[in-house]
Each structure stands twice: as C-alpha cells, then as structure tokens.
C-alpha cells in the first residue's frame, strides 16, 4: 500500500475533473476584483494538474432574485440562473468566492446561495439530491474581520444543500483594522501572506483529493439518503416510535 505521506502529485490523476469558481465580487468586469487575485492562486494549482476549470463573475449575469429554479416562470422578465445551474452540475468542484462587507458575505454571494438552494429539490438518477457526489469550498477577501464567520455561513449552506466539504475548505485574506489596502493593492502584503497562501493551497488540494475519491467511488452510496425512496414509503431502518 502506498504511504500517503510520501506520495507525490504524480500519484493521482485529476484530468477528468471539472471545477467551477464563482466570483461574487460586487464589481462588474473588467473592473479589478481583489477576490480574483485569490482565485487565481487556487485555480493555477488545479490547472497545473489538468483540471478543466471554468469561472464566472456572478454580477456580470442577470441572475434574478428568488428561490425557484427559473424565475421567468414567476414573473421575472429574464433569469440567467438556469444556464449557470447547468455549469454548476457539470462541475465536480464548486468554489464560492467573494468579498466581506460589514463582517458578512456580499449580497451577490447570498443571491448565488439562494439560487443554489432554489434547485436543491432536484434529484439525481439515484434519487439523491442533485448536489450529492460533489465537493465545495470558499475563498474570501476583505478588511478587518469576518473570514471565519463568512466561511462558516457559506460552507454550512453548501453542505446543507448536499455538497461534501473536505477538511480546511476555506481560505481568505483580511487587512488590518480600519481603512487600508485591499488584497491586490501595492503594499498590502496579501499575495505574500504565508497563512493565506498555505490555507489556499491546502483547500485546493483537499478539494482535489475528495473530488477524486468521490468520483472513483461513484459518488455517495445511494442508500438511506434517497428522497425518492423516502417519498415512496421506505424508511431505511428508521424506528417509528408509534409501533414500539
């Protein structure tokens, strides 16, 4: 058996994996996004190992507000989400990325999570929720405080929807308290910060490893977690106290 502590990157293949980074910056393209700087660090690791990486800046798309899969069926004149959702389902790895404002996630981040939730009732071929068998993480940038709070919110939301979260699946950078330079600004120290660089690297590799494991295993085993079977009356050994 291979000792995992001595294995190198050539020990695994990732060239059949797909990753999607969603940048939830408030800035439309082509305005510079500090979050993009952190995305580029993580993305370069994945691409170096053959992962097919897609990326989108959510604010560039006409994503309607709501909690239905297609909001044009609920009064909105247009909705870019159905097309984005197809990209989400095509990805083995999802990384939600965004800025911190007032110690919290951006409004764009919250909208993307709401729309992911809008599709959470969709089932896969095994009768599980559609996000099963996929992994997720998050990257955050900002000033002063809020990285752990924001990561907690994002990662909880994603696991609740069905994503599998690996160890240390978040990374971020924040500046000193008070007004000051952001991640990509000259003199910020962000790109040189060892703590941020380490966590970004660990997050990226843990996403790769867990995505590899799930893909090789055919996803999460389909027993005890199938909504279609539960609705049909199967209770998977759940003891009904009324019959005791």
Task: Pin down the residues of each PLM region.
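N-terminal beta1-alpha1-beta2 submodule of the flavodoxin-like/Rossmannoid cofactor-binding fold
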Residues: 1-126, 190, 194-244
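A short small-residue
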Residues: 20-23, 175-190
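Short, glycine-/small-residue-rich phosphate/pyrophosphate-handling segment
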Residues: 33, 125-179, 195-198
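Short aromatic-enriched loop/helix-cap "lid" or pocket-rim segments at secondary-structure transitions
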Residues: 65-69, 151, 179-181
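Short alpha-helix boundary/capping motifs
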Residues: 74, 164, 182-187, 235
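A general structural signal for short secondary-structure boundary/capping elements
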Residues: 101-103, 145, 183-189
